[in-house]
Amino acid sequence: YGEAPISVSGIGPDYVDLTIRRVGRVTGEVFERYEGDSLFMRGPYGNGFDVDDYKDSELVIIAGGTGVSPVRGVAEYFSHHPGEQRGMTMIAGFKSPGDILFQADFKEWEKTMDLFLTVDGAEDGYEGRVGLVTKYIPDLNLKDASSAKAIVVGPPDMMRFSVKGLLERGFLEENIWVSYERKMCCGIGKCGHCRIGDKYVCVDGPVFPYTVGKNLLD
């Protein structure tokens, strides 16, 4: 049935959390036939978010949908080590209330950070926030945007407009990191499936500083 790139959303002493979205043949097969079985996994490949880059700073995380998965580790780390930074805010967006991932985590994280949890649309009577993640960028409570750090993960258009909003708020390009989700195959930079310009997402990324990443949006 082939292979599929999967986001690592958590690591423990003897386990790894994977966030799998059912979107095609391979992931559909995992959901249908292999519950409780052992599957072959290779990797991890590429880079990740280094928490040292965000220590002693105000940090803003903007994530859309399954884009929350790769930033879950950063949020979890600073929720347990709040003294290592100057303040943290997360804006997380989902299509609908039923699509919200990691609900238990959000309840814990909001104890140590400002949390904007929003959905694109909801039925009448929904009491949470409704709107795109960019709607809440003007509401960020920051002491100094020019020294704050930001992580943005999600679909290309969402990342493009989120970064635009951050720059308008006074963030510097060198203080913004983006992560690209692009179809990967070999994982070692040989097949070219994930090539954007002269970069290979599986080798050079998927995390890029925006000074590099701004030239890679496709």
Which residues does each predicted region cover?
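Ferredoxin-reductase
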Residues: 1-37, 94-95, 121
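Phosphate- and divalent-cation-binding pockets in alpha/beta enzyme and binding domains
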Residues: 29, 70-73, 101, 161-162
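A short, hydrophobic beta-strand micro-motif
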Residues: 37-44
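Residues at the starts of beta-strands that form the adenosine-phosphate
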Residues: 38, 57-58, 84-89, 114, ...
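Short, structured patches in soluble enzyme cores that scaffold and shape functional sites
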Residues: 43, 63, 90-95, 117-119
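A short, basic/flexible loop-to-alpha-helix module at the beginning of a structural domain
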Residues: 44-54
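Histidine-anchored nucleotide/phosphate-binding helix
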Residues: 70-82
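Reductase modules of NAD(P)H-dependent flavoproteins
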Residues: 96-218
